[in-house]
From Swiss-Prot:
UniProt keywords, alphabetically: ATP-binding, Chaperone, Cytoplasm, Isomerase, Nucleotide-binding
First-level EC class: isomerase
Cellular component terms (Gene Ontology): cytoplasm
Residues holding ATP: 30-33, 51, 87-91, 415, 479-481, 495
Function: Together with its co-chaperonin GroES, plays an essential role in assisting protein folding. The GroEL-GroES system forms a nano-cage that allows encapsulation of the non-native substrate proteins and provides a physical environment optimized to promote and accelerate protein folding.
Organism: Tolumonas auensis (strain DSM 9187 / NBRC 110442 / TA 4)
This protein's name: Chaperonin GroEL
Name of the gene encoding the protein in the UniProt record: groEL
EC number: 5.6.1.7
Matches recorded under NCBIfam families: GroEL, PRK00013.1, PRK12849.1, PRK12850.1, PRK12851.1
Length: 545
């Protein structure tokens, strides 16, 4: 077993604090509308330029192992804030640094670390309740746009695009961010249910200019197996031909004789048909076929429940106003399913989201909800260079997470004002003993640190602004972008309550652990083996005659 290096007490805490400061100082320069950029070197390609706190934190790895432990613990704060709310990473880091710095000063002055931690936890619990009372619902498009703008570092265009996307696909709709083709940001909305499976044969194409299949008022046959024998489908094909409607077949696969016969029928104009593979795999495919059935008021023909394709009737087929099939995607527009049944299905999937522990499963279930609820929006980010594209895309994703959080739990005054107001309300809070009360004071003082850092990054004097904001009431605060005091909500400077709450909770959680640390253990640095001794000089050859 390798030898260990062990540090105790203040020696350990000083080293840990040095690591915390290196990471936090690198991250906090990005906070606020006048926050600066950080340039990250890459082993290949151009460096990355970012104003995203968690991206900066993830890059930091220190040589000194004790300092590195401190840095990694604060990195955890930024990562947790990012995972839970998608934003607030820099705020969480600034709060953690402040609580740790003040807390370790109190420990050095002889306070009991465990009581300090209890005091900090007590203050944070009370502050969270206070934030909930300060919170205002984020209901209208204007408020959503403002939250998106603030989170995207005051980029109004991004805020407007996100608000427009939410307006079109609903609060539960899926909004994705992709690389755009031009210089402008664009929003593309896919109406109806879309899944990533295209036509099985190009001979089904009936719109040559767009290389797509477009069928109006079609029947939809949903089959949970491979179809290779045309005899199984004859009764359905005859019924559809008599009705004079087109048919879309969505099955695990359609191959061989069955596919060839469908192609021939289409080319001769006997019946308009298109075949598509069912989306997903395994159990997820079965669930998505069921979703399509509910959306189109059809039935999935499945041998598992004793149904046979040969006996399928027109009553078991789904219907939709229109279906568009391209090489890669199929879009079902205006399925005839009943609204109540679709709502019940959405509620059922939401229940599965609540119960699921896997992020991947949650994401896939959320996509299914969006497809049933009617739409997917794609924000295409435009930029001049690839470096700018990466930076901007990260900002748009942050803003998207922030707006979702705002819709979920409401908004509070931005610019660090909400935390200052919450701290002011708790000025008389006392602990069970003197040390706990000091812990409460440490947490309340730290709650001013985001406001001070925003002001500092804007080149103003933090103490002057903090005093002025403290004297004000309600949503009165300082707009660092315009250097104007006023009502933060009216100026459109909002932070999602969830983001502010989680930043404070995560920061206090990790800071509490660090304050109560008494010993740190790491691998001792390996001593280099002694170098090989020099070989004696080789004798030269004698002079040649």
């Amino acid at each position: 077993m390798a030898a260990k290096d062990v540090k105790f007490g203040s020696d350990a805490r000083i080293k840990m604090l040095e690591g915390v400061n290196v990471l936090a100082n690198a991250v906090k320069v990005t906070l606020g509308p006048k926050g600066r950029n950080v340039v990250l070197d890459k082993s290949f390609g151009a460096p990355t330029i970012t104003k995203d706190g968690v991206s900066v934190a993830k890059e930091i790895e220190l040589e000194d192992k004790f300092q590195n432990m401190g840095a990694q613990m604060v990195k955890e704060v930024a990562s947790q804030a990012n995972d839970a709310a998608g934003d607030g990473t820099t705020t969480a880091t600034v709060l953690a640094q402040s609580i740790i710095t003040e807390g370790l000063k109190a420990v050095a002055a002889g306070m009991n670390p465990m009581d300090l931690k209890r005091g900090i936890d007590k203050a944070v619990l009370a502050a969270v309740e206070e934030l909930k009372t300060l919170s205002v619902p984020c209901a209208d498009t204007k408020a959503i746009a403002q939250v998106g703008t603030i989170s995207a570092n005051s980029d109004e265009n991004v805020g407007k695009l996100i608000a427009e996307a939410m307006d079109k696909v609903g609060r539960d709709g899926v909004i994705t961010v992709e690389d755009g083709q031009g210089l402008q940001d664009e929003l593309a909305v896919v109406e109806g249910m879309q899944f990533d499976r295209g036509y099985l044969s190009p001979y089904f194409i009936n719109k040559q200019d767009t290389a797509s299949v477009e069928l109006d008022d079609p029947f939809i046959l949903l089959v949970d197996k491979k179809v290779s024998n045309i005899r199984e489908m004859l009764s359905v094909l005859e019924g559809v031909a008599k009705a004079g409607k087109p048919l879309v077949i969505i099955a695990e696969d359609v191959e061989g004789e069955a596919l060839a016969t469908l192609v021939v029928n289409t080319m001769r104009g006997i019946v308009k048909v298109a075949a598509v593979k069912a989306p997903g795999f395994g159990d997820r495919r079965k669930a998505m076929l069921q979703d399509i059935a509910i959306l189109t008021a059809g039935t999935v023909i499945s041998e598992e429940i004793g149904m046979e394709l040969e006996k399928a009737t027109l009553e078991e087929l789904g219907r939709a106003k229109r279906i568009v099939i391209t090489k890669e995607n199929t879009t079902i527009i205006d399925g005839v399913g009943e609204a109540a049944t679709i709502e019940a299905r959405i509620a059922q999937i939401r229940q599965q989201i609540e119960e699921s522990s896997s992020d991947y499963d949650k994401e896939k279930l959320q996509e299914r909800v969006a497809k049933l609820a009617g739409g997917v929006a794609v924000i295409k980010v435009g930029a001049t260079t690839e470096v700018e594209m990466k930076e901007k895309k990260a900002r748009v994703e942050d803003a998207l997470h922030a707006t979702r959080a705002a819709v979920e739990e409401g908004v509070v005054a931005g610019g660090g004002v909400a935390l200052v107001r919450a701290a002011a309300k708790l000025a008389d809070l006392k602990g069970d003993n003197e040390d706990q009360t000091v812990g409460i004071r440490v947490a309340l003082r730290a709650m001013e640190s985001p406001l001070r850092q925003i002001v500092d990054n804007a080149g103003e004097e933090p103490s002057v602004v903090a005093n002025r904001v403290r004297e004000g009431e309600g949503n009165f605060g300082y707009n660092a972008a315009t250097e104007v005091y006023g009502d933060m909500l009216e100026m459109g400077i909002l932070d999602p309550t969830k983001v502010t709450r989680l930043a404070l909770q995560f920061a206090a959680s990790v800071a509490g652990l660090m304050i109560t640390t008494e010993c740190m253990i790491t691998d001792a640095p390996k001593k280099d083996a002694p170098a090989m001794p020099d070989m004696g000089g080789m004798g030269g050859m004698g002079g040649m005659m």
